[in-house]
Swiss-Prot record:
The gene is metK. It holds the Pfam family S-AdoMet_synt_C. This is S-adenosylmethionine synthase. Binds 2 divalent ions per subunit. Binds 1 potassium ion per subunit. Mg(2+) binds at D16. It catalyses: L-methionine + ATP + H2O = S-adenosyl-L-methionine + phosphate + diphosphate. SUPFAM superfamilies: S-adenosylmethionine synthetase. ATP binds at H14, D172, G173, K174, R238, F239, D247, R253, K254, A270, K274. L-methionine binds at E55, Q98, D247, K278. GO terms for cellular component: cytoplasm. Keywords: ATP-binding, Cytoplasm, Magnesium, Metal-binding, Nucleotide-binding, One-carbon metabolism, Potassium, Transferase. It is found in: Cytoplasm. K(+) binds at E42. Its main location: cytoplasm.
Length: 391
Protein backbone atom coordinates (compact mmCIF):
# COMPACT_ATOMS: atom_id res chain seq x y z
CA UNK A 1 0.00 0.00 0.00
CA UNK A 2 1.27 3.45 -0.94
CA UNK A 3 0.58 6.67 0.95
CA UNK A 4 1.94 10.21 1.23
CA UNK A 5 2.88 12.03 4.44
CA UNK A 6 4.03 15.65 4.77
CA UNK A 7 5.90 17.57 7.48
CA UNK A 8 7.21 21.12 7.67
CA UNK A 9 10.07 22.97 9.32
CA UNK A 10 10.93 26.66 9.67
CA UNK A 11 14.23 28.53 9.82
CA UNK A 12 15.60 30.32 12.86
CA UNK A 13 14.45 33.62 11.34
CA UNK A 14 10.76 32.68 11.30
CA UNK A 15 8.89 35.05 13.67
CA UNK A 16 7.64 32.27 15.97
CA UNK A 17 11.10 30.72 16.10
CA UNK A 18 12.69 34.07 16.96
CA UNK A 19 10.44 34.05 20.02
CA UNK A 20 11.32 30.47 20.96
CA UNK A 21 15.03 31.27 20.76
CA UNK A 22 14.72 34.45 22.82
CA UNK A 23 12.73 32.63 25.52
CA UNK A 24 15.28 29.81 25.68
CA UNK A 25 18.25 32.20 25.60
CA UNK A 26 16.81 33.90 28.69
CA UNK A 27 16.23 30.50 30.32
CA UNK A 28 19.82 29.45 29.59
CA UNK A 29 21.22 32.69 31.02
CA UNK A 30 19.31 32.11 34.27
CA UNK A 31 20.20 28.40 34.56
CA UNK A 32 23.86 29.23 33.99
CA UNK A 33 23.85 31.37 37.14
CA UNK A 34 21.03 29.70 39.09
CA UNK A 35 20.37 26.04 38.21
CA UNK A 36 17.30 26.06 40.46
CA UNK A 37 15.72 29.10 38.84
CA UNK A 38 12.06 28.82 37.88
CA UNK A 39 11.30 30.21 34.45
CA UNK A 40 8.14 30.52 32.35
CA UNK A 41 9.16 33.07 29.75
CA UNK A 42 7.01 34.08 26.78
CA UNK A 43 8.07 36.33 23.91
CA UNK A 44 6.19 38.13 21.16
CA UNK A 45 7.67 40.00 18.21
CA UNK A 46 6.22 42.32 15.61
CA UNK A 47 7.56 45.16 13.48
CA UNK A 48 10.24 46.93 15.51
CA UNK A 49 9.35 45.54 18.93
CA UNK A 50 10.02 42.55 21.21
CA UNK A 51 7.82 41.88 24.25
CA UNK A 52 9.12 39.53 26.96
CA UNK A 53 6.72 38.46 29.69
CA UNK A 54 6.16 35.66 32.15
CA UNK A 55 6.99 34.37 35.60
CA UNK A 56 10.60 34.07 36.76
CA UNK A 57 11.85 33.24 40.27
CA UNK A 58 15.63 33.37 40.66
CA UNK A 59 18.35 34.72 42.93
CA UNK A 60 20.42 36.00 39.99
CA UNK A 61 20.26 38.94 37.61
CA UNK A 62 20.28 38.67 33.84
CA UNK A 63 20.13 41.54 31.37
CA UNK A 64 17.06 40.59 29.35
CA UNK A 65 17.27 43.37 26.71
CA UNK A 66 20.92 42.50 26.08
CA UNK A 67 20.06 38.80 25.68
CA UNK A 68 17.23 39.69 23.29
CA UNK A 69 19.44 41.84 21.07
CA UNK A 70 22.24 39.27 21.04
CA UNK A 71 19.82 36.50 20.02
CA UNK A 72 18.24 38.57 17.25
CA UNK A 73 21.73 39.50 16.01
CA UNK A 74 22.84 35.85 15.89
CA UNK A 75 19.73 34.92 13.92
CA UNK A 76 20.65 37.53 11.33
CA UNK A 77 18.31 40.49 11.71
CA UNK A 78 21.10 43.06 11.64
CA UNK A 79 19.85 45.69 9.19
CA UNK A 80 16.85 47.98 9.30
CA UNK A 81 16.02 47.19 5.68
CA UNK A 82 15.18 43.63 6.79
CA UNK A 83 12.21 45.16 8.60
CA UNK A 84 13.59 44.15 11.99
CA UNK A 85 16.93 45.14 13.50
CA UNK A 86 18.69 43.91 16.64
CA UNK A 87 20.08 47.35 17.50
CA UNK A 88 17.01 49.52 16.94
CA UNK A 89 14.08 47.27 17.95
CA UNK A 90 12.32 48.18 21.19
CA UNK A 91 12.46 45.62 24.00
CA UNK A 92 9.63 45.67 26.56
CA UNK A 93 9.69 43.37 29.61
CA UNK A 94 6.93 42.41 32.05
CA UNK A 95 8.15 39.77 34.50
CA UNK A 96 6.46 38.47 37.67
CA UNK A 97 7.50 35.81 40.19
CA UNK A 98 6.22 32.23 40.00
CA UNK A 99 2.94 31.75 41.85
CA UNK A 100 3.50 30.59 45.44
CA UNK A 101 0.60 28.16 44.99
CA UNK A 102 2.44 26.43 42.12
CA UNK A 103 5.80 26.57 43.89
CA UNK A 104 4.51 24.73 46.97
CA UNK A 105 3.55 21.73 44.83
CA UNK A 106 6.74 21.68 42.79
CA UNK A 107 9.13 22.19 45.71
CA UNK A 108 7.76 19.18 47.59
CA UNK A 109 5.54 16.59 45.99
CA UNK A 110 2.39 15.14 47.54
CA UNK A 111 4.16 11.81 48.11
CA UNK A 112 6.94 13.54 50.05
CA UNK A 113 4.46 15.41 52.23
CA UNK A 114 2.90 12.06 53.08
CA UNK A 115 6.32 10.58 53.88
CA UNK A 116 6.07 8.04 51.06
CA UNK A 117 9.45 8.73 49.39
CA UNK A 118 12.76 10.52 49.63
CA UNK A 119 12.67 14.25 49.00
CA UNK A 120 15.53 14.19 46.48
CA UNK A 121 13.35 12.61 43.82
CA UNK A 122 10.03 13.89 45.10
CA UNK A 123 9.82 17.03 43.02
CA UNK A 124 6.17 17.46 42.09
CA UNK A 125 5.08 17.95 38.51
CA UNK A 126 4.76 21.65 37.68
CA UNK A 127 1.40 21.13 36.00
CA UNK A 128 -1.08 18.49 34.96
CA UNK A 129 -1.05 17.23 31.40
CA UNK A 130 -0.01 14.49 29.02
CA UNK A 131 3.16 14.28 26.97
CA UNK A 132 4.07 12.01 24.07
CA UNK A 133 7.36 10.55 22.88
CA UNK A 134 7.90 8.89 19.52
CA UNK A 135 10.66 7.01 17.70
CA UNK A 136 10.94 5.04 14.48
CA UNK A 137 13.78 3.12 12.85
CA UNK A 138 13.11 4.57 9.37
CA UNK A 139 15.99 7.09 9.66
CA UNK A 140 19.35 7.19 11.44
CA UNK A 141 17.90 9.93 13.67
CA UNK A 142 15.13 7.54 14.80
CA UNK A 143 12.75 10.18 13.44
CA UNK A 144 10.07 10.13 10.75
CA UNK A 145 11.68 10.93 7.40
CA UNK A 146 9.42 13.90 6.46
CA UNK A 147 10.38 16.01 9.49
CA UNK A 148 14.02 14.85 9.40
CA UNK A 149 14.42 16.05 5.80
CA UNK A 150 12.44 19.25 6.39
CA UNK A 151 14.79 20.18 9.26
CA UNK A 152 17.85 19.44 7.12
CA UNK A 153 16.55 21.79 4.43
CA UNK A 154 15.80 24.57 6.94
CA UNK A 155 19.23 24.27 8.53
CA UNK A 156 20.86 24.34 5.11
CA UNK A 157 18.96 27.54 4.22
CA UNK A 158 20.55 29.21 7.24
CA UNK A 159 24.00 27.83 6.38
CA UNK A 160 24.09 29.16 2.80
CA UNK A 161 22.78 32.53 4.02
CA UNK A 162 25.32 32.89 6.80
CA UNK A 163 28.39 31.62 4.92
CA UNK A 164 27.67 33.85 1.92
CA UNK A 165 26.97 31.04 -0.58
CA UNK A 166 23.58 32.65 -1.25
CA UNK A 167 24.09 36.10 0.22
CA UNK A 168 20.79 37.43 -1.10
CA UNK A 169 18.81 35.24 1.31
CA UNK A 170 17.30 36.76 4.45
CA UNK A 171 16.51 35.03 7.75
CA UNK A 172 12.83 34.07 7.40
CA UNK A 173 11.96 30.80 5.69
CA UNK A 174 9.94 27.57 5.72
CA UNK A 175 10.40 24.11 4.24
CA UNK A 176 8.03 21.21 3.66
CA UNK A 177 8.67 17.64 2.52
CA UNK A 178 6.19 15.05 1.27
CA UNK A 179 7.40 11.44 1.47
CA UNK A 180 5.86 8.52 -0.38
CA UNK A 181 5.61 5.36 1.71
CA UNK A 182 5.20 1.84 0.39
CA UNK A 183 4.15 -0.80 2.92
CA UNK A 184 5.00 1.68 5.68
CA UNK A 185 8.57 2.23 4.40
CA UNK A 186 9.75 5.56 2.93
CA UNK A 187 10.69 5.08 -0.74
CA UNK A 188 10.94 8.53 -2.35
CA UNK A 189 10.43 12.27 -1.99
CA UNK A 190 7.21 13.23 -3.75
CA UNK A 191 7.28 17.00 -3.19
CA UNK A 192 9.44 19.73 -1.68
CA UNK A 193 8.26 23.22 -0.77
CA UNK A 194 10.73 25.97 0.15
CA UNK A 195 9.69 29.54 0.88
CA UNK A 196 12.61 31.80 1.77
CA UNK A 197 12.89 35.52 2.30
CA UNK A 198 15.26 37.23 -0.13
CA UNK A 199 16.57 40.59 -1.25
CA UNK A 200 14.56 42.55 -3.84
CA UNK A 201 17.33 42.45 -6.43
CA UNK A 202 17.25 38.72 -7.17
CA UNK A 203 14.92 37.08 -9.69
CA UNK A 204 12.70 34.07 -9.06
CA UNK A 205 14.38 31.85 -11.66
CA UNK A 206 17.79 32.34 -10.04
CA UNK A 207 16.40 31.59 -6.57
CA UNK A 208 14.76 28.41 -7.85
CA UNK A 209 17.93 27.20 -9.56
CA UNK A 210 20.16 28.00 -6.56
CA UNK A 211 17.92 26.38 -3.96
CA UNK A 212 17.50 23.14 -5.89
CA UNK A 213 21.24 22.83 -6.53
CA UNK A 214 22.73 24.21 -3.30
CA UNK A 215 20.07 23.34 -0.75
CA UNK A 216 17.88 20.44 -1.89
CA UNK A 217 20.49 18.32 -3.65
CA UNK A 218 23.04 19.11 -0.95
CA UNK A 219 21.04 17.54 1.89
CA UNK A 220 18.71 14.97 0.29
CA UNK A 221 20.09 11.68 -1.02
CA UNK A 222 19.80 11.41 -4.82
CA UNK A 223 18.12 7.99 -4.57
CA UNK A 224 15.14 9.68 -2.89
CA UNK A 225 14.72 12.19 -5.74
CA UNK A 226 13.43 11.24 -9.19
CA UNK A 227 11.96 12.83 -12.32
CA UNK A 228 8.53 12.89 -10.69
CA UNK A 229 9.62 14.79 -7.58
CA UNK A 230 7.84 18.15 -7.54
CA UNK A 231 9.59 21.36 -6.44
CA UNK A 232 7.72 24.43 -5.21
CA UNK A 233 10.29 27.16 -4.63
CA UNK A 234 8.82 30.46 -3.37
CA UNK A 235 5.55 29.54 -5.10
CA UNK A 236 4.08 33.05 -4.64
CA UNK A 237 6.94 34.35 -6.80
CA UNK A 238 8.29 36.89 -4.30
CA UNK A 239 9.17 36.89 -0.58
CA UNK A 240 10.93 40.16 0.27
CA UNK A 241 8.86 41.31 3.25
CA UNK A 242 9.32 38.73 6.00
CA UNK A 243 10.27 38.16 9.60
CA UNK A 244 8.43 40.16 12.28
CA UNK A 245 7.63 42.85 9.69
CA UNK A 246 5.59 40.34 7.70
CA UNK A 247 4.06 38.36 10.58
CA UNK A 248 3.97 38.70 14.34
CA UNK A 249 5.57 35.87 16.28
CA UNK A 250 4.89 34.13 19.58
CA UNK A 251 6.69 31.57 21.74
CA UNK A 252 5.25 28.06 21.53
CA UNK A 253 3.45 28.25 18.19
CA UNK A 254 5.59 25.68 16.37
CA UNK A 255 5.03 22.63 18.59
CA UNK A 256 4.70 20.18 15.69
CA UNK A 257 7.88 21.50 14.06
CA UNK A 258 9.57 21.10 17.46
CA UNK A 259 8.56 17.45 17.76
CA UNK A 260 7.69 14.85 15.12
CA UNK A 261 6.14 16.77 12.25
CA UNK A 262 2.65 15.42 12.86
CA UNK A 263 3.71 11.78 13.12
CA UNK A 264 2.44 10.57 16.46
CA UNK A 265 0.32 12.63 18.82
CA UNK A 266 1.07 15.78 20.80
CA UNK A 267 -0.05 16.68 24.30
CA UNK A 268 -0.33 20.38 23.43
CA UNK A 269 2.38 21.80 25.69
CA UNK A 270 5.17 23.91 24.21
CA UNK A 271 8.81 23.67 25.29
CA UNK A 272 10.67 26.97 24.95
CA UNK A 273 11.04 29.33 27.88
CA UNK A 274 10.20 26.65 30.45
CA UNK A 275 12.59 25.36 33.10
CA UNK A 276 12.76 21.56 33.57
CA UNK A 277 10.32 21.45 36.50
CA UNK A 278 7.67 22.03 33.83
CA UNK A 279 6.73 18.53 32.67
CA UNK A 280 5.53 19.98 29.37
CA UNK A 281 9.22 20.06 28.59
CA UNK A 282 11.09 17.58 30.79
CA UNK A 283 8.55 14.74 30.50
CA UNK A 284 8.31 15.18 26.72
CA UNK A 285 12.10 14.88 26.57
CA UNK A 286 11.95 11.81 28.80
CA UNK A 287 9.24 10.28 26.62
CA UNK A 288 11.45 10.68 23.55
CA UNK A 289 14.37 9.13 25.50
CA UNK A 290 12.21 6.14 26.44
CA UNK A 291 10.76 5.67 22.95
CA UNK A 292 14.13 5.92 21.21
CA UNK A 293 15.78 3.39 23.53
CA UNK A 294 12.88 0.96 23.15
CA UNK A 295 13.04 1.10 19.34
CA UNK A 296 16.84 0.83 19.37
CA UNK A 297 16.49 -2.27 21.58
CA UNK A 298 14.36 -3.89 18.87
CA UNK A 299 11.08 -3.91 20.79
CA UNK A 300 9.24 -2.24 17.88
CA UNK A 301 9.89 -0.61 14.51
CA UNK A 302 8.04 2.47 15.69
CA UNK A 303 6.66 3.34 19.08
CA UNK A 304 4.77 6.10 20.83
CA UNK A 305 4.58 6.52 24.60
CA UNK A 306 2.22 8.74 26.56
CA UNK A 307 3.03 10.02 30.05
CA UNK A 308 0.47 11.88 32.17
CA UNK A 309 0.97 13.89 35.37
CA UNK A 310 -0.98 15.71 38.09
CA UNK A 311 0.31 19.01 39.44
CA UNK A 312 2.26 18.57 42.66
CA UNK A 313 2.40 14.77 42.29
CA UNK A 314 5.68 13.08 41.40
CA UNK A 315 4.71 9.72 39.89
CA UNK A 316 3.02 9.69 36.48
CA UNK A 317 -0.69 9.04 36.79
CA UNK A 318 -0.52 6.88 33.66
CA UNK A 319 1.91 5.38 31.13
CA UNK A 320 0.64 4.12 27.78
CA UNK A 321 2.46 2.59 24.79
CA UNK A 322 1.39 2.15 21.15
CA UNK A 323 3.58 0.22 18.69
CA UNK A 324 1.20 0.56 15.73
CA UNK A 325 1.28 -3.18 15.16
CA UNK A 326 5.10 -3.33 14.94
CA UNK A 327 5.78 -4.53 18.49
CA UNK A 328 7.67 -7.75 19.16
CA UNK A 329 6.03 -8.17 22.58
CA UNK A 330 2.71 -7.12 24.11
CA UNK A 331 2.30 -3.42 24.84
CA UNK A 332 1.40 -4.13 28.48
CA UNK A 333 4.77 -5.89 28.84
CA UNK A 334 6.52 -2.88 27.32
CA UNK A 335 4.94 -0.63 29.95
CA UNK A 336 6.25 -2.97 32.66
CA UNK A 337 9.76 -2.73 31.16
CA UNK A 338 9.51 1.07 31.07
CA UNK A 339 8.56 1.17 34.75
CA UNK A 340 11.55 -1.03 35.66
CA UNK A 341 14.19 0.70 33.52
CA UNK A 342 13.14 4.37 33.74
CA UNK A 343 12.25 6.55 36.72
CA UNK A 344 9.75 9.03 35.30
CA UNK A 345 9.20 11.23 38.33
CA UNK A 346 10.09 14.84 37.42
CA UNK A 347 12.94 15.02 39.93
CA UNK A 348 14.44 11.80 38.59
CA UNK A 349 14.07 12.95 34.98
CA UNK A 350 15.88 16.19 35.83
CA UNK A 351 18.61 14.20 37.61
CA UNK A 352 19.06 11.44 35.03
CA UNK A 353 19.06 13.77 32.03
CA UNK A 354 20.95 16.52 33.89
CA UNK A 355 18.45 19.15 32.78
CA UNK A 356 19.39 22.04 35.10
CA UNK A 357 21.91 23.27 32.55
CA UNK A 358 21.93 25.98 29.86
CA UNK A 359 21.32 23.57 26.96
CA UNK A 360 18.02 24.84 25.57
CA UNK A 361 18.82 27.69 23.17
CA UNK A 362 20.50 25.21 20.81
CA UNK A 363 17.28 23.23 20.32
CA UNK A 364 14.94 26.20 20.02
CA UNK A 365 15.25 25.97 16.22
CA UNK A 366 15.47 22.93 13.89
CA UNK A 367 13.81 20.51 16.28
CA UNK A 368 14.27 19.23 19.83
CA UNK A 369 14.56 15.60 18.75
CA UNK A 370 16.67 13.58 16.32
CA UNK A 371 19.47 16.13 16.31
CA UNK A 372 22.74 14.85 14.86
CA UNK A 373 24.57 18.18 15.20
CA UNK A 374 24.44 18.51 19.01
CA UNK A 375 24.78 16.11 21.95
CA UNK A 376 21.50 15.92 23.84
CA UNK A 377 20.90 13.76 26.94
CA UNK A 378 17.44 12.62 25.83
CA UNK A 379 18.88 11.36 22.53
CA UNK A 380 21.39 9.00 24.18
CA UNK A 381 20.93 5.23 23.70
CA UNK A 382 22.09 4.50 27.25
CA UNK A 383 19.25 2.20 28.38
CA UNK A 384 19.22 -0.23 25.44
CA UNK A 385 21.12 -3.00 27.23
CA UNK A 386 19.01 -2.61 30.37
CA UNK A 387 15.87 -2.99 28.25
CA UNK A 388 17.21 -6.09 26.48
CA UNK A 389 17.62 -7.87 29.82
CA UNK A 390 13.84 -8.07 30.10
CA UNK A 391 13.28 -9.50 26.60
Amino acid sequence: MRKLFTSESVTEGHPDKICDQISDAILDAILEKDPNGRVACETTVTTGIVNVMGEISTNCYVDIPKIVRKTVREIGYTRAKYGFDCDTCAVVTSIDEQSADIAMGVDEALESKKGEMDKIDAVGAGDQGMMFGYATNETKEFMPMPIALAHRLSRRLAEVRKDGTLDYLRPDGKTQVTIEYEDDKPVRVDAIVISTQHGPEIGHEQIEKDLIEKVVKYVISPELLDENTKYYINPTGRFVVGGPQGDSGLTGRKIIVDTYGGYGRHGGGAFSGKDPTKVDRSAAYAARWVAKNLVAAGIADKLEIQLAYAIGVAKPVSISVDTFGTGKIEESKIVEIVEKVFDLRPGAIIRDLNLKRPIYRQVAAYGHFGRLDVELPWEQLDRVEAIKKYL
